Each structure stands twice: as C-alpha cells, then as structure tokens.
Design a protein with these regions (language model features):
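An N-terminally biased module of ancient metal coordination in phosphate/nucleic-acid-related enzymes
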Residues: 1-68
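A generic "structured core" feature
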Residues: 1-10, 14, 42, 123-124, ...
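Catalytic metal-binding/acid-base residues of hydrolase active sites
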Residues: 8, 55, 169, 201-202
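Non-membrane alpha-helical structural segments and their capping/turn regions in soluble enzymes
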Residues: 27, 31, 89, 122-126, ...
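Alpha-helical scaffolding within the catalytic cores
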Residues: 33-37, 59-62, 88-93, 148-149, ...
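Active-site gating/metal-coordination segments in enzymes
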Residues: 59-146, 153-155, 190, 195-204, ...
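Short hydrophobic/aromatic-enriched beta-strand-loop microsegments
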Residues: 75-79, 162-167
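H/E-rich (His + Asp/Glu) clusters that bind or coordinate divalent metals
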Residues: 172-219
C-alpha cells in the first residue's frame, strides 16, 4: 500500500484560507474536496492519503476527523494545536470524544507564519510537544530557514517525540540559495527522531521558469 503523507482539502464557503494571498495563487482559489483529490491522484499509484490542517482554526480538525471516518481514502489526519498555548493539551483532549479521533496521527502549527523565530523553542512548546510524544502523536515542523535553529533545539529537547519536517523547510530554491539551509538540514538529519517530507518544492522555485535540475541540490 502506498500512502501519500500530505494533502489538503478545503471549502471556501466554510472558511477562508488566509494563506491564499496574491495573484499567483489564483489558480487554486477554489474549493478542493476529497473527491477532487481522488480524481487528481487517479493513476498515480496512491492508495490512501494523510490530510493535513490548513488554518489556525480549532473548527477545522473535527471536520477532517469526520472526513477520515467517512471516506476510505483518508488514512490519517494531522490536526491543529496552537502549540505554545497553556491549554493546547486541553484542546487535544477535546478532540478525543469526536468521531474519527482514532485517525489523528499528528499535530501541526503554522510556525513559519509567526514573527518570533524562536517560537518552537519556547518552554511551553517543548512541554506540549513532549506530551504529544507520550501520546504517540507526531509533531509536524512547518518552518522556513529563520525558524530552523529553534526547530532543531525542539527536536533535541523531545527525544521521545517523532517529528516530520514539512516541505524540507522551504529553502530558497528560486535564488539557488543553499545556506544556511544546507547546514541546518544536515544537523537535523543527524537526529534519529525526525524524518522529512519531500514536498512543496515547486512553491519555493521560480514558478514560471523552474526546471527539474533546480531541485537536485536540495535532494
């Protein structure tokens, strides 16, 4: 069985997707449902998918859990927690009675949108992420280069939590800029409790003029 580890679905009539900013994203500023996804992956050899939160909104995760419970295409859900909040684990507990809770496999916060580049090394973040590990949940790291130092420190502080680095931390592919990303990713790779999703590369390249050779140095 082949499971794709990262897909998003959304309904713009239910909530806005605040990250869809600028003309470049106009082609995807439309609803994208699980059936749209099913059609898109036809013939790709993908049997199931993990759906991942898209917004910092506690209402979205219950919807994704219900989707997982009702559609066999969904193998798991990565839900949302504001991971630096004192009540983050209480919010996690609030998911437990919900339909589809058994499909919750991980948690993500959109850390790269926060101005504080040390966000992921906050003591409360460390505490909450350690608790995720005790509960058998993965923490998805959504970072860019400025946030990687804190991400590395978090992974080191939580040896019993498994981490997934999303989108190889969004290096500056369009600028062919390897540093400090290359040193950071090498250090992160030395830690046994983290893996990486090779995803989201095209969005960091020159959208109109990219070629496959642009990506080789980052892989």
């Amino acid at each position: 069985m082949r499971i794709d580890s990262h897909h998003h679905v959304w309904d713009l009539s239910v909530r806005e997707q605040g990250w869809m900013v600028g003309e470049a994203l106009n082609p995807i500023k439309k609803n994208f449902s699980i059936n749209d996804l099913r059609q898109a992956i036809t013939g790709c050899g993908i049997d199931k998918t993990v759906v991942v939160q898209t917004v910092t909104n506690y209402d979205e995760t219950p919807e994704l859990l219900e989707l997982a419970d009702t559609d066999d295409l969904v193998a798991g859900v990565v839900g949302f927690l504001k991971i630096d909040a004192d009540d983050a684990i209480a919010h996690l507990d609030s998911y437990q009675p919900l339909r589809g809770f058994k499909y919750l496999v991980g948690i993500r916060d959109i850390a790269h949108d926060y101005e504080d580049v040390k966000y992921l090394s906050k003591p409360q973040v460390v505490k909450n992420v350690q608790e995720l590990g005790r509960r058998g949940l993965v923490y998805d790291l959504l970072t860019k280069t400025p946030h990687m130092r804190a991400a590395i420190d978090l992974v080191k502080a939580c040896p019993n939590t498994k981490f997934v680095l999303d989108h190889i931390s969004k290096p500056y592919i369009a600028k062919a800029d390897m540093q400090p990303w290359a040193d950071q990713i090498t250090e992160l790779a030395s830690l046994e409790n983290v893996v990486v999703k090779v995803s989201g590369l095209f969005t960091e390249a020159d959208w109109k003029n990219w070629k496959k050779e642009d990506f080789w140095p980052y892989l």
